[in-house]
């Protein structure tokens, strides 16, 4: 017989913990229930919003939650200053949406950024089921591409297996379908991103309400369900998420020494993942260079063959011409 009471208590406890952490208190995991609490048991879905600053992550989070939970303004600058998590439900299932501060900018990692990244890990531990890469329709820029690279650096290169591209400003499609837009885009960086994400994408009009809002959320959740089935219910994890869980079980506050060690671990793991990303990119470049070289060798061989055939034909014609005059 299923213990629905424990499941409900676990969900409420997690909700309380999330609200405590949102207020900036790291000492939010009490020994009561936390050692036995399992996110998997409660069926809680963890959704992490990623993307460059000002891309509309907070507004997208509000659309998913169907309420103004995150501060959002109509401007191209980030409003979110620290990680924030909010609970919602869809068709009877609880989910957690984590909004992120500007940690995906191409800048030098400092102590404040270590803290922002560490808190983000704390929010979505033991790992997100899905990462939503938020970008504006028709505005995928170099900054967006750099933000994607930072996502890989912060969460590891394997994170793309759990990513869905979410385009904002769906209303700008007009009579064109999203499939047509993505298929015929001339933006090579966007094309590469969509392929890397397994062609998982959808679009939101964050001004929508009522049935339109419900419809686009249903489309997103259908994508999420397929992604979960593909991974058999697993979520993205790495060494830092494992270490984060160990830290959480201690129930330490941000003013205690273990929290400083935790931030040191955050920096070390992000640096390690950065090196792994660079190695992967180097390997990819080497393979591309090899392919180009192979293509060049093939073209050279064909060119030489054509030259030889041409010279042979020319010599034959000359001999025939000389033979006629003898």
Curated annotation (Swiss-Prot):
Q: Which residues lie on this side of the membrane: Cytoplasmic?
A: 1-297
Q: Which GO terms describe its cellular component?
A: lysosomal membrane; mitochondrion; multivesicular body membrane
Molecular function (Gene Ontology), one example: GTP binding
**Which residue windows are transmembrane per the record?**
298-318
GO term, biological process aspect, one: positive regulation of membrane potential
Annotated localization: Lysosome membrane; Endosome, Multivesicular body membrane; Endosome membrane
What membrane topology does the UniProt entry give? Single-pass type IV membrane protein
Residues noted as binding GTP in the record, renumbered to the chain: 51-59, 72, 169-171, 206
Q: Just give the chief location class.
A: membrane
Keywords linked to the UniProt accession: Endosome, GTP-binding, Lysosome, Membrane, Nucleotide-binding, Transmembrane, Transmembrane helix
The AIG1-type G domain covers which part of the protein? 42-245
Residue ranges annotated as Lumenal topological domain: 319-326
User: Where does the entry say this protein is expressed, by tissue?
Assistant: Primarily expressed in spleen, heart, lung and intestine and, at lower levels, in kidney, stomach and muscle. Expressed in thymus and lymph nodes (at protein level). In the spleen, expressed in periarteriolar lymphatic sheets. Isoform 2: Expressed at higher levels in T lymphocytes compared to isoform 1.
Q: What is its biological role?
A: Required for mitochondrial integrity and T-cell survival. May contribute to T-cell quiescence.
Clinical condition linked? Diabetes-prone biobreeding (DP-BB) rats have a frameshift mutation in Gimap5, which results in a truncated protein in which the C-terminal 215 amino acids, including the membrane anchor, are replaced by 19 other amino acids. These animals exhibit life-long T-cell lymphopenia, including lack of regulatory T cells, and spontaneously develop insulin-dependent diabetes resembling human type 1 diabetes.
Family of the protein in this entry: Belongs to the TRAFAC class TrmE-Era-EngA-EngB-Septin-like GTPase superfamily. AIG1/Toc34/Toc159-like paraseptin GTPase family. IAN subfamily.
Q: Which PANTHER family match?
A: GTPASE IMAP FAMILY MEMBER 5 (PTHR10903:SF69), GTPASE, IMAP FAMILY MEMBER-RELATED (PTHR10903)
Subunit info? Interacts with BAD, BAK1, BAX, BCL2, BCL2L1/Bcl-xL and BCL2L11/BimEL. The interaction with BAX is increased, when cells initiate apoptosis upon IL2 withdrawal. Forms a complex with BCL2L1 or MCL1 and HSPA8/HSC70; the interaction between HSPA8 and BCL2L1 or MCL1 is impaired in the absence of GIMAP5. May interact (via N-terminus) with microtubules.
- Protein name, please? GTPase IMAP family member 5
């Amino acid at each position: 017989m299923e213990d629905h009471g424990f499941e409900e208590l676990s969900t409420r406890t997690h909700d309380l913990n999330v609200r405590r952490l949102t207020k900036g208190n790291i000492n939010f995991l009490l020994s009561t229930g936390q050692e036995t609490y399992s996110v998997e048991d409660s069926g809680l879905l963890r959704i992490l919003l990623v993307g460059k600053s000002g891309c509309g992550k907070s507004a997208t989070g509000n659309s998913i939650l169907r309420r103004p939970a995150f501060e959002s303004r109509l401007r191209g600058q980030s409003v979110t200053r620290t990680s924030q998590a909010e609970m919602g439900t869809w068709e009877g299932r609880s989910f957690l949406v984590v909004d992120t501060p500007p940690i995906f900018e191409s800048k030098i990692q400092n102590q404040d950024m270590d803290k922002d990244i560490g808190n983000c890990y704390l929010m979505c531990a033991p790992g997100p089921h899905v990462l939503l890469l938020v970008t504006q329709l028709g505005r995928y820029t170099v900054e967006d591409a750099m933000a994607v690279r930072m996502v890989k650096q912060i969460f590891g290169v394997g994170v793309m297996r759990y990513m869905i591209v979410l385009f904002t400003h769906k209303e700008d499609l007009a009579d064109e379908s999203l499939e047509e837009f993505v298929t015929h885009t001339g933006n090579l960086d966007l094309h590469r991103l969509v392929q890397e994400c397994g062609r998982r994408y959808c679009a939101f009009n964050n001004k929508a309400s009522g049935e339109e809002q419900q419809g686009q959320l249903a489309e997103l959740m259908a994508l999420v369900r397929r992604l979960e089935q593909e991974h058999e219910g697993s979520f993205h994890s790495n060494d830092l998420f494992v270490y984060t869980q160990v830290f959480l079980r201690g129930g330490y506050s941000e003013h205690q020494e273990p929290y400083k060690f935790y931030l040191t671990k955050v920096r070390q793991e992000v640096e390690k993942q950065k090196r792994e990303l660079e190695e992967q990119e180097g390997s990819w470049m080497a393979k591309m260079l090899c392919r180009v070289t192979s293509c060049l060798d093939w073209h050279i061989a064909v060119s030489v063959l054509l030259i030889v055939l041409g010279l042979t034909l020319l010599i034959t014609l000359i001999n025939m011409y000389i033979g006629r005059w003898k």
